[in-house]
Amino acid sequence: MRPAVQVALLGGSFNPPHVGHLMAATYVHATQDVDEVWLMPSWQHPFGKQMEPFEHRVAMCDALCAETSGWLKTSRIEQEPGLSGRTVDTLTLLVARHPDIRWSIIIGSDILRDLPHWKDFHRIEELSRVMVLNRAGYPAPNTLGPPLAEVSSTLIRDLLARGEAPSDLVPARAIAYAREHGLYGLKRTP
């Protein structure tokens, strides 16, 4: 019997969230028999990268979710006290809290090279279905779907630092939020 709800988790820094995240979530929702996709911004980056504050990244993810009909949601689970920022710990907590949900994890093929550094990846595979999406420039066997758009949060931050508008890479509501709050060096809007 199919579980009541099937949820795919798309974790990341979302610093900022962009159309690549939206396209990946939309692809999984449309083709992989999941009811919801949850964006899961990291509280702190497990490898120490600097990010905008969590609340701002959550708000920009919420703006991205507003582009959908309710199947895309933002999870604040990573702000839970005691979580390490490691996927296996977050997933273990989610499984304990929601045993009726069938969990999936979405990763891009660009992440495959980092898996040896992930804590207990074998446990992640036991707790969830791991979906590896085909990211352009990172060919790998057994990936799902066509290559994803070549867009990254790093590229967007670089464009913003040069004073260029990434309007075709970041949904309007998310970039408006960033501008309103002066994130990424953007001048605040009144």
UniProtKB/Swiss-Prot annotation:
Similarity comment: family membership: Belongs to the NadD family.
Top EC category: transferase
Lineage summary: Bacteria, Pseudomonadati, Myxococcota, Myxococcia, Myxococcales
Name the record gives this protein: Probable nicotinate-nucleotide adenylyltransferase
Pathway: Cofactor biosynthesis; NAD(+) biosynthesis; deamido-NAD(+) from nicotinate D-ribonucleotide: step 1/1
Record-linked InterPro entries: Cyt_trans-like, NadD/NMNAT, Rossmann-like_a/b/a_fold
Record carries keyword Disulfide bond: no
Keywords annotated in UniProt: ATP-binding, NAD, Nucleotide-binding, Nucleotidyltransferase, Pyridine nucleotide biosynthesis, Transferase
Top-rank taxon, per record: Bacteria
Gene3D superfamilies attached to this UniProt entry: HUPs (3.40.50.620)
Its EC number(s): 2.7.7.18
Reaction equation(s) it catalyzes: nicotinate beta-D-ribonucleotide + ATP + H(+) = deamido-NAD(+) + diphosphate
Organism of provenance: Myxococcus xanthus (strain DK1622)
GO BP annotation list: NAD biosynthetic process
